[in-house]
Amino acid sequence: MRSITALFFLFCFLAPSALAQLRTGFYSRSCPRAESIVASVVANRFRSDKSITAAFLRMQFHDCFVRGCDASLLIDPRPGRPSEKSTGPNASVRGYEIIDEAKRQLEAACPRTVSCADIVTLATRDSVALAGGPRFSVPTGRRDGLRSNPNDVNLPGPTIPVSASIQLFAAQGMNTNDMVTLIGGGHSVGVAHCSLFQDRLSDRAMEPSLKSSLRRKCSSPNDPTTFLDQKTSFTVDNAIYGEIRRQRGILRIDQNLGLDRSTSGIVSGYASSNTLFRKRFAEALVKMGTIKVLTGRSGEIRRNCRVFNN
């Protein structure tokens, strides 16, 4: 109950324009089963593929940090009309078929009512809970964007300095605490290819036994993957922060969160309290989900998440 209350007060401090028509239970009358339909689709896939939590966390981050949470990432490229989806780091985002299935069922139940942007938000929230993370309410009422341009994509890489990452998050209305929470929480269930952390394999700021293990794995020419959280790889919890404190962060940005004076205290706080992490992670996800949203008459409600209506 306390976490729900905290989230209620969080809504009150978010940008008024974002909250003007976003609210918890937005579809309670227009499509009463909306949230349960999305939850069912996500749960069905989670039973056979627990990695979808990482996929959805990445999908929502990549969507919201490019022109806001408007499902512009979901638009398929066409001949002569490229989109965000196939550009740079977005090329490896996955989970679109789960969004498609949720949309198909929602269109059958409530045609042209539930936005693709809300489906992404709900699916991410539900997958986090399934992976042992916090359960929380999210406001809905987003509309889908009318633009998906690869030139808009400017997402951080795994070697971004902490100071630059702080600036990038600040440009989206997110503070340093939000940044540490979302990066660590998102990476608590993710994987990375060796090519993304080759620079760490000669880094003195990596625990020696982990470094040796990764060097052996990454000697393969097939660019294998490894879990970013070596301790609880499929659970959304605070374990990754403890790993970072023990110099076992895989990506440079992860480890640097524990070394930089502006973020190390936050890492230590989360490492010592999963309760604190769970509360802050729920709050940060809700806050990220309000970045530059379209509401009211702006945008559209897509019939198919992969294409604009016109």
From Swiss-Prot:
Note: There are 73 peroxidase genes in A.thaliana.
Pfam families: peroxidase
Binding site for heme b: 187
Domain of life according to the entry: Eukaryota
Record InterPro entries: Haem_peroxidase, Haem_peroxidase_sf, Peroxidase_pln, Peroxidases_AS, Secretory_peroxidase
EC number assigned by the record: 1.11.1.7
Family: Belongs to the peroxidase family. Classical plant (class III) peroxidase subfamily.
Underlying gene: PER44
Binding residues for Ca(2+) 1: 63, 66, 68, 70, 72
Disulfide bonds listed in the record: 31-110, 64-69, 116-305, 194-218
Record's catalysed reaction(s): 2 a phenolic donor + H2O2 = 2 a phenolic radical donor + 2 H2O
PROSITE patterns (alphabetical): PEROXIDASE_2 (PS00436), PEROXIDASE_4 (PS50873)
Annotated residues for binding of substrate: 156
Gene Ontology biological process: hydrogen peroxide catabolic process; response to oxidative stress
Species: Arabidopsis thaliana
Listed name of the protein: Peroxidase 44
Alphabetic keyword roster: Calcium, Disulfide bond, Heme, Hydrogen peroxide, Iron, Metal-binding, Oxidoreductase, Peroxidase, Secreted, Signal
Obligatory cofactor(s): heme b; Ca(2+)
PANTHER family according to UniProt: PEROXIDASE, PTHR31517
Cofactor: record remark: Binds 1 heme b (iron(II)-protoporphyrin IX) group per subunit. Binds 2 calcium ions per subunit.
Molecular functions (GO terms): heme binding; lactoperoxidase activity; metal ion binding
Keyword Disulfide bond: yes
Active site per the UniProt annotation: 62
